[in-house]
Amino acid sequence: MPNSTAQYPEKDSWEFLVKSGIAGGTAGCVAKSVVAPLDRVKILYQTNHASYRGYAYSRHGLYKAIKHIYHVYGLHGLYQGHTATLYRVFPYAGIKFVAYEQVRRVLIRDPEHETHARRFLSGSLAGTCSVFFTYPLELIRVRLAYITNTGKNPTLTQVTKDIFHERDFLCNKKYPGLSRLSKICNFYRGFSVTLTGIFPYAGMSFLAYDLATDFFHKQKIDEWVSTKKSDKKLKTWPELLCGAFAGVCGQTVSYPFEVCRRKMQIGGIRKNKSFLRLKQVVQTTYKEAGMRGFFVGLTIGYIKVIPMVSTSFFVYNHSKALLGID
């Protein structure tokens, strides 16, 4: 691969936007596919599903939960809702990486502006942008993963219809003209808390990845972690380690928000198809399990996030190289 940056397209060109979007979308899909079974179990834990409540705090609960799902529903059960995940992840990851590259280009125009705050803000704004455009698909994915006892596998079409016809957060009697709009808002259950959580998660993930990369590029370390082809490119293992560090940092700071978000997303199933407010979710969670209720499934989160984020950054960087962008 040529080392001259002059041969790469400019970051504000359409070619770079399209190719970075493809690279980001591909990275997201590969990463999510790697950890799909863990994601299914984590959602069941976070939403306090009655059939899996006993596994959540047990020593070997993760293994037992996966074994139970496989025994009852087969391999497909571990990937239930994964199609909806891929529909969401490709545009989500694509938009996130494109937005990050563009926001970073604006906020960090030269090395003097490359501060921790600007790096964090670049990641946070990128995550916010991607969530806004893809949240309805995320809600559908969570519903598909949560449903377990219908006797047949729920379909994407059926779940979408169910969400649309659920009781909306506006009273139709008071606001009859907003009925259709409020139905669309059904697909944004938990959106406010999602934004609250994605801001620190995305910001910390990108910041931690940059800091880890900077660490490996220090002179005494760079000699044995960089490839021979390019001083800028890390070997596989340090590159994966940077992604793992980024994932752990992002997951830690945002996990309580994620637990609340999941419970708000499935509120239409559990609470007479009504909207759950953040205050209700926080009070109920604390009453049922105390502070540890906000961190239920965090172990799975760590187990999941290390391979997922590592794979995501790794595939993104190598996809960019294959597509001829930097």
Swiss-Prot record:
Keywords: Membrane, Mitochondrion, Mitochondrion inner membrane, Repeat, Transmembrane, Transmembrane helix, Transport. GO terms for biological process: mitochondrial coenzyme A transmembrane transport. GO terms for cellular component: mitochondrial inner membrane. Solcar repeats lie at residues 15-106, 114-215, 234-322. Pfam families: Mito_carr. Its main location: mitochondrion. InterPro entries: GDC-like, Mit_carrier, Mitochondrial_sb/sol_carrier, Mt_carrier_dom_sf. The chain crosses the membrane at residues 16-36, 83-103, 120-140, 191-211, 240-260, 294-314. It is a multi-pass membrane protein. It is found in: Mitochondrion inner membrane. It comes from the Eukaryota. One of its GO terms (molecular function) is coenzyme A transmembrane transporter activity. Belongs to the mitochondrial carrier (TC 2.A.29) family. This is Uncharacterized mitochondrial carrier C17H9.08.
